[in-house]
């Protein structure tokens, strides 16, 4: 088994940090649904401003708010206005990489989804596992995307 990215929020802005809350990251559930991130799912967080890297779990905030709030100890690593990357992962076999289609959301000001991308692993002419990033923003209704199944 290998650990791979399953969903990613790339360039989302931290809207708050609550040191006194008991852990987690609070995210807009509409954003999570577009990417395929579930409540209580563990995610990795990488702070582009400071370089800090942490792991915590997701809880849902107000739908449509664009919220991205670090809670508890995580609040020490990310402050309001920091730009972060949030990645969900899963364990899978290399052969399943051909069917796994992770969604990556990029953001504009106010944490509005700018683009919807998809990672694609395919058999190339020179190697068994090749890689490309596809922009599916115009090809699919990003707001109507169903969460990505974690298990087959």
From Swiss-Prot:
Keywords associated with the record: Autocatalytic cleavage, Cytoplasm, Decarboxylase, Lyase, Pantothenate biosynthesis, Pyruvate, Schiff base, Zymogen
SUPFAM superfamilies cross-referenced by the UniProt entry: ADC-like
Family as reported in the entry's similarity comment: Belongs to the PanD family.
E.C. no: 4.1.1.11
Matching Gene3D superfamilies: 2.40.40.20
Main location: cytoplasm
Residues reported to bind substrate: 56, 72-74
Description of how the protein assembles with itself and partners: Heterooctamer of four alpha and four beta subunits.
Record lineage: Bacteria, Pseudomonadati, Pseudomonadota, Alphaproteobacteria, Rhodospirillales
Keyword Cytoplasm: yes
GO cellular component: cytosol
Cofactor field: pyruvate
Residues the record lists as Pyruvic acid (Ser) modifications: 24
HAMAP family given in the database record: PanD
InterPro entries for this protein: Asp_de-COase-like_dom_sf (IPR009010), Asp_decarbox (IPR003190)
Keyword set includes Nucleotide-binding: no
Cofactor: record remark: Binds 1 pyruvoyl group covalently per subunit.
Stated name of the protein: Aspartate 1-decarboxylase
Catalytic activity: L-aspartate + H(+) = beta-alanine + CO2
Pathway(s) it belongs to: Cofactor biosynthesis; (R)-pantothenate biosynthesis; beta-alanine from L-aspartate: step 1/1
């Amino acid at each position: 088994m290998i650990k791979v990215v399953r969903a990613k929020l790339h360039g989302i802005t931290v809207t708050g940090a609550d040191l006194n809350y008991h852990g987690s990251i609070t995210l807009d559930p509409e954003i999570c649904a577009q990417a395929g991130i579930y409540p209580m799912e563990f995610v990795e967080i990488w702070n582009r401003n400071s370089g800090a890297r942490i792991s915590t779990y997701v809880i849902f905030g107000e739908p449509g708010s664009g919220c991205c709030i670090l809670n508890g100890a995580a609040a020490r690593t990310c402050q309001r206005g920091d730009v972060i990357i949030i990645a969900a992962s899963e364990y899978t076999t290399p052969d399943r990489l051909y069917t796994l289609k992770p969604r990556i959301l990029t953001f504009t000001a106010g944490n509005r989804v700018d683009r919807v991308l998809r990672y694609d692993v395919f058999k190339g002419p020179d190697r068994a596992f090749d890689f490309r990033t596809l922009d599916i923003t115009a090809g699919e209704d990003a707001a109507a995307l169903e969460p990505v199944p974690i298990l087959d």
